[in-house]
């Protein structure tokens, strides 16, 4: 049994829906759930969530958000959309695809080389600025300044200016692509009502499995 919402986005919400709807559930999640690997990933969260502390539950929600909802995975040296939230949102999907193109156009990533290794290199080199951006996004959430589609990237761009981070090179697109990092994901809030400022990329399906297990499995295996 797969439970879905009874809400359907309006015509003027085709670019971006502020909450999950029937289209998201049926077009986004349902096809993925026919894939054994995706279904096994989805099954990891509930057992851990049941035994987790409140603080751990917040991390688990974010891990689910940035994997099965807004995850990206490398396959054949190309970045593939894995998250149901990306695939069912026209604007989110367009932002992601355009970022793949922009990284090449701006010579940030050379797609003839090892793409994930280059992404990891940019991430490591800019980790301090990424941490500052995440802290800033967290503060914006707490102030309620990322609660709508219009606020999303407008306030993030203003944040870049405030932090003195130039919107070029690795930071020049509509979204930041970063290697899947549990510690980093634990810090960034879920961006439900506005565009996501960051997506996380796994080197492989096996790596996603291992990284999620590294956090979820010890919690799920706790004695009751």
Language-model regions, residue ranges each:
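Core of folded catalytic or high-affinity ligand/protein-binding domains
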Residues: 1-224
